[in-house]
Amino acid sequence: MQSTHISGGSSGGGGGGGGEVSRSGLSRIRSAPATWIETLLEEDEEEGLKPNLCLTELLTGNNNSGGVITSRDDSFEFLSSVEQGLYNHHQGGGFHRQNSSPADFLSGSGSGTDGYFSNFGIPANYDYLSTNVDISPTKRSRDMETQFSSQLKEEQMSGGISGMMDMNMDKIFEDSVPCRVRAKRGCATHPRSIAERVRRTRISDRIRRLQELVPNMDKQTNTADMLEEAVEYVKALQSQIQELTEQQKRCKCKPKEEQ
C-alpha cells in the first residue's frame, strides 16, 4: 500500500518501511497505515509540536508552506490535486472539519464559489441529493421483506394443507380393513382349498339325488331340514317293508289244481 503525507519542517524524520523524502517535503511510504501514523508521531516529537496536534492541522500547516505537489506516479498526482482543491478553498488555510455524516459534509462544502471538487469539472451548484430520484434503501428493503414474508406465508399455508390431507389419508388407510378378493370358483391352487371344493361338490351331488328320491324335499331350503326329511322318508319305507314281510308270512295260498 502506498500513501503520502507532507512533513512539518524542511527535514522530516525517517519513515518506516523504506520511506523516501524529496526536497519538496513529500514523503513516500510503502507500508501499512499504522506505520505511517507512527512516522507522523515521531516527526511531531522531533519538531517539538504539541502532543494533541491533529493530523488535519499538520496537513493544513504544510499546505500553506508546501505549494503544489508533483509526483511521477498518476496516483500521487490525483491525491495532490484533491488536496490542493481541498486546502485552497479557505484563504485562512484552516481545514474544514465536520462531525456529521458525509452527506452533510458534502452539502456544506459545496456552498462555496468553486467547491471542493472544482478541479474535477464538477460545478458548485450541482444537486448531489436530487429530490426526483427516490433512493430510500429502507423502503426498498421493507418492500422486499413484506414480499418475502407473504410468499413464505403462502408456501406454509399450501404446505400445511397438503400435510393435513396426507395425515387424513394415512389415518383413513390405518382405520380401514384391507379388502381380500376371493378367488374365482375352480381357480384355487392350495391343496386344502382344492379338497374343500371337492367335498362340497360331492355333498351337493348327493343332496340332489336325495331330492330326486325323497318327495317334498326340494321344498326345504336348509340342508339340515332336507336331511331330516330324507331320514323320515327312509324310516317310513322301512316300516312298510316290515308290514309287507309279516303279511307275506301269514298268507297261505292254495294251488290252482286243488281249486
Swiss-Prot record:
GO molecular function, one term: cis-regulatory region sequence-specific DNA binding
Compositionally biased spans, kind Gly residues: 9-20
Any one of the GO BP annotations: response to heat
Region (Disordered): 1-25
GO CC terms of this entry: nucleus
PROSITE patterns: BHLH
Keywords, alphabetical: DNA-binding, Nucleus, Transcription, Transcription regulation
Localization per record: Nucleus
Keyword Nucleus among UniProt keywords: yes
Sequence ranges assigned to domain bHLH in this UniProt record: 187-237
Complexes and interactors: Homodimer.
Protein's name according to its UniProt entry: Transcription factor bHLH80
Organism of provenance: Arabidopsis thaliana (Mouse-ear cress)
Gene (UniProt): BHLH80
